[in-house]
Design a protein with these regions (language model features):
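Feature representing long, continuous alpha-helical segments
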Residues: 79, 109, 113, 122, ...
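Amphipathic heptad-repeat alpha-helical coiled-coil/stalk segments that mediate oligomerization
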Residues: 197-208
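Non-catalytic DNA-recognition/assembly elements of restriction-modification systems
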Residues: 1-22, 149, 153-157, 164-199
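Proline-centric
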Residues: 2-3, 98-108, 136, 140-169
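Sequence-specific dsDNA recognition surfaces
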Residues: 12-24, 33-68, 78, 93
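A short beta-sheet element
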Residues: 60-62, 66-121, 127-140
Length: 208
């Protein structure tokens, strides 16, 4: 039994899918996210691709904006999903993702938490196993038709304020870690071969 004031609705009533899609032709470099490059909201790599010198994958079509949820439609149990915070203007993701945009921005975090809970992943994985395809997969209608237990708007708003701060901090921490890792990888070989010492002024390297 659900609490008083709560409702059970289909997830698709609160969001739209794949709102922004490119024709695949770009006149500027892009940052491409493939399904294998994000796991449980952690991006391993964004591929920098320049159409003047690189082959742009045919699946590089989905455009994303702040707060969009990307959810791989292949093998949901592998957890290739995340919520996009502070995306670059030229970020493009694979058509292997369902890109989910909440109709009301406050819902994005609530919907994301619902989609990544164990019961939902298990449910979608079961659906994927029965798919008539070469590999376990789902489609957007499978996500749209999920039953979502929704609290009152006032509770959603309160939750969203806290969740937004947390996800922004997670994004900031991730970018700082990537920057520090890059600096380490650049400086360690120089330290090992004697080009710099632990007492050197490393500020020039930090600015790279």
């Amino acid at each position: 039994e659900i609490p008083k004031g709560w409702n059970v609705l289909k997830l698709g009533e609160h969001c739209s899918f794949n709102k922004r899609t490119s024709n695949g032709y770009f006149n500027h470099p892009i940052l491409y996210l493939d399904t294998s490059n994000i796991t449980n909201n952690t991006i391993d790599e964004l591929q920098f691709l320049n159409p003047s010198s690189d082959i742009i994958p045919s699946r590089a079509r989905r455009l994303v904006q702040e707060g969009d949820i990307v959810y791989s439609t292949v093998r949901p149990n592998l957890k290739h999903f995340g919520i996009i915070m502070n995306p670059d203007y030229n970020m493009v993701v694979s058509t292997g993702f369902a890109v989910i945009t909440a109709n009301w921005s406050a819902y994005r975090y609530f919907i994301y938490q619902f989609l990544i809970q164990a019961a939902t992943i298990e449910n979608l994985s079961t659906i994927a196993q029965s798919a008539v395809s070469a590999y376990p997969s789902i489609n957007t209608s499978d996500i749209e038709n999920l039953d979502l237990v929704v609290p009152p708007d006032s509770m959603i708003e309160k939750y969203a304020k806290t969740a937004c701060r947390l996800y922004l901090q997670i994004d900031t921490n991730y970018k700082e870690i990537k920057s520090l890792t890059k600096q380490r990888d650049e400086l360690l070989p120089l330290l090992m071969n004697g080009q710099v010492s632990v007492n050197s002024d490393l500020s020039v390297y930090k600015k790279r």
